[in-house]
């Protein structure tokens, strides 16, 4: 389960580094601390996210200054996302970053959650800090470009996509971003050219068909949009993203199928409790 990272070497190293200090602590607290961490993993692996959250909180509260708490707070944020507690998750990530500002994993997790909750200014700030440390990281640049695009700061979005291409001229991810950007700008002919090219290169990629469906919907070509949407669902193999469901809901609403639209919206809302975009 990707949201519950068994801290592996990092956790073991942190625990070892703390062992000298632990000698000054009550041995029972140290033993209980480790037991609570183990219980949190066991609960999470069984799908008991409320239990995992409770065990992690108890471990952090038991020894508040333990250096491993940085990683436990990141895990706590992931568990809280799975529970749909997005604001609590943001608070957990922020507490972890206050202790270790350079932790890229936690900052990326917070940036994605900011974007998921529509807080794109905050997301851009986190992505910018990540990019300052890794200027050519394609994932960071792409995600910041998408936040810029949703903020209608199209020139800044284009700049990030251009940076990706400068470092990787064959990047299909950047081309997908350009297709979405040109659609948002209303440059539909250029967007269609990009998506048609991507379909030939990434014929089994659901994101490409979802992107072209957005284009067709913007051009009021609902039949074509629905065709690409169904292809995207087929390629998602029963695991559609919330954005895919919301887009199909929008298409079905436009076609007058309100029942299907409402069903997809409910499904999207349920998935968003657990989803990182």
Label for each model-derived stretch:
Residues 71-75, 109, 143-146, 150, ...:
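Canonical tetratricopeptide repeat
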Residues 20-73:
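N-terminal leader/linker segments that initiate helical-solenoid repeat arrays
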Residues 64-67, 101, 135, 169, ...:
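Short coil turns that delineate tetratricopeptide repeat
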Residues 69-72, 106, 140, 174, ...:
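TPR alpha-solenoid repeat register
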Residues 45-46, 82, 116-117, 150-151, ...:
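Register position in tetratricopeptide repeats
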């Amino acid at each position: 389960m990707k949201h519950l990272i068994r801290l592996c070497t990092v956790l073991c190293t942190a625990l070892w580094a703390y062992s000298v200090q632990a000698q000054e602590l009550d041995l029972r607290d140290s033993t209980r601390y480790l037991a609570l961490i183990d219980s949190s993993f066991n609960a999470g692996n069984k799908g008991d996210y409320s239990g995992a959250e409770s065990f992690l909180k108890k471990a952090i509260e038991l020894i508040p200054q333990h250096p491993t708490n940085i990683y436990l707070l990141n895990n706590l944020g992931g568990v809280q996302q799975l529970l749909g507690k997005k604001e609590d998750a943001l608070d957990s990530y922020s507490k972890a970053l206050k202790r270790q500002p350079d932790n890229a994993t936690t900052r990326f997790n917070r940036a994605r959650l900011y974007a998921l909750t529509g807080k794109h200014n905050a997301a851009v700030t986190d992505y910018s800090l990540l990019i300052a440390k890794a200027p050519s990281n394609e994932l960071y640049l792409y995600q910041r470009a998408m936040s810029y695009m949703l903020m209608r700061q199209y020139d800044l979005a284009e700049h990030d996509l251009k940076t990706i291409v400068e470092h990787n001229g064959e990047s299909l991810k950047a081309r997908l971003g350009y297709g979405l950007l040109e659609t948002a700008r209303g440059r539909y002919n250029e967007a269609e050219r990009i998506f048609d090219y991507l379909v030939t290169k990434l014929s089994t990629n659901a994101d490409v068909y979802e992107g072209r469906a957005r284009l067709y919907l913007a051009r009021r070509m609902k039949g074509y949009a629905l065709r690409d949407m169904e292809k995207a669902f087929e390629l998602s193999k029963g695991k559609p993203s919330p954005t895919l469901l919301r887009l199909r809901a929008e298409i079905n609403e436009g076609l007058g199928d309100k029942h299907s639209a409402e069903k997809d919206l409910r499904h999207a809302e349920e998935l968003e409790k657990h989803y990182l975009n």
